[in-house]
Amino acid sequence: MTTENEITALGEFNKKFENTYELFKKNLENDEEVGASFAVYQNGEVLVNLYGGYRDRDKKNKWDQNTIVNIHSTSKGIVAMIVAKLIDENKLDLEKNVADYWPEFANGGKESIKVKTLLSHQAGMYGWRQPIDETDFYKWDYVVDLLANQEPYHKADEKICYHPKTIGFLVGELIKRVTNKSV
């Protein structure tokens, strides 16, 4: 069943999920969210694929089914499971250097940073030394190249410093180098 609402909610859903659609629509109509997408697939079947609202707070640019967003922390659980699976399959070794999988990462004096050091936020790679714009977050190759080529902010294993903006790129690129697939 395909649905279109004059106000904001668009998409398709299995009729068993009509309540999900109604909650999504209400959320947008009540201005609880400026814009959003929500999709659920089971065994390749679309159960819910909803989107709507706006891409900006000024409500000038509508959210469409192809709107790309940076999901930040929501990917951490998925990434952790992928890393655990790669370790279990002996495709990734916590004791090996990141550069063994991602050779360019060795630039800037990072040749001896271990996978476990990167995963535990002790690599000193919590930011970009070169100023970047928020729109750069959508340019994967650009931001991972910057990270690969820069020096760390401190010596690896010297201290723990949360990598909130870079960890997704760092571990995501490591996974990509091991599996030839993006997260």
Q: Model regions: which residues?
A:
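Active-site helix/loop module of the DD-peptidase/beta-lactamase fold
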Residues: 65, 70, 74, 88-130, ...
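Alpha-helix C-terminal capping/helix-coil junction sites
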Residues: 28, 87-88
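Membrane-embedded glycan transfer/ligation machinery
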Residues: 34, 77-80, 99, 168-172
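Glycan-recognition surfaces in beta-rich domains, encompassing non-catalytic CBMs
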Residues: 84
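Catalytic-site signature segments of enzymes, centered on catalytic residues
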Residues: 129-183
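Hydrophobic (often cysteine-bearing) scaffold residues that line and stabilize catalytic clefts
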Residues: 16, 20, 71, 75, ...
